[in-house]
């Protein structure tokens, strides 16, 4: 269910702000979004998996906090990321 190393590398390369950037809010939000999207497919098949659902809710909350942080720091970066990831807001 977790992202493979190749998938993570591709996401990091797409959203990083510099060559060595792996922890900026944009990268973290993109990784969380990919994990959330992957888990949603899991729940289509396993509706009663409440333990994993708890992890999903935790990821969604963490992404929400990071989005709020980014919005407070730089609205332009926030808007660009929302549009790039296709998140509704």
UniProtKB/Swiss-Prot annotation:
Task: Give an example GO cellular component term for this record.
Answer: cytosolic small ribosomal subunit
- Stretches of Basic and acidic residues bias are at 1-18
Region described as Disordered: 1-25
Give the record's GO biological process terms: translation
Functional note = One of the primary rRNA binding proteins, it binds directly to 16S rRNA where it helps nucleate assembly of the platform of the 30S subunit by binding and bridging several RNA helices of the 16S rRNA. Forms an intersubunit bridge (bridge B4) with the 23S rRNA of the 50S subunit in the ribosome.
Describe the family membership recorded for this protein in Swiss-Prot or TrEMBL: Belongs to the universal ribosomal protein uS15 family.
Protein name in UniProt: Small ribosomal subunit protein uS15
- Phylogenetic lineage: Bacteria, Pseudomonadati, Pseudomonadota, Gammaproteobacteria, Cellvibrionales
In the UniProt record, what gene is named as encoding this protein? rpsO
